[in-house]
């Protein structure tokens, strides 16, 4: 086996998540398809999806990891019941809520700033919510950008988080 082009391009978490969710749907590994498959098996139909349990498990784990909001902190008491819609939505990552159009729009807006490709990739993957987080991603942020520009960047990013 010969490597033709080494590290031709980077993939964002959104692109990986989209590919893997499409793979789940294609091979009937998503929750809706699995429920429908169980129901059809009970009726006697034998629809066999692509059977590769290791790939299915890895795909499910990666999709679950990418769908979780890493910045979410559960601040509820143990005895309280949480609201299913509001809490579940807060636990989802920003990239799991994005569409192709919103992802392209975010990238277009980030292209208006003088950021390196790796910095844009990190911003899209992490969707920083505060200045400290953005400073950890953007190299020499205080020297390259003034405070107004940084606030503008954070405002744009918060619209997609």
Curated annotation (Swiss-Prot):
An example Gene Ontology biological process: termination of RNA polymerase III transcription
Gene3D superfamilies: 1.20.1250.40, 6.10.140.870
Region described as Disordered: spans on this chain: 75-96
Tagged with keyword Nucleus: yes
UniProt keyword ATP-binding, yes or no: no
Listed Basic and acidic residues bias regions: 82-96
Subunit record text: Component of the RNA polymerase III (Pol III) complex consisting of 17 subunits. Forms a Pol III subcomplex with RPC25/RPC8. Interacts with BURF1/TDS4.
Similarity comment: family membership: Belongs to the eukaryotic RPC9 RNA polymerase subunit family.
Other facts noted in the record for this chain: Present with 2930 molecules/cell in log phase SD medium.
Name of protein: DNA-directed RNA polymerase III subunit RPC9
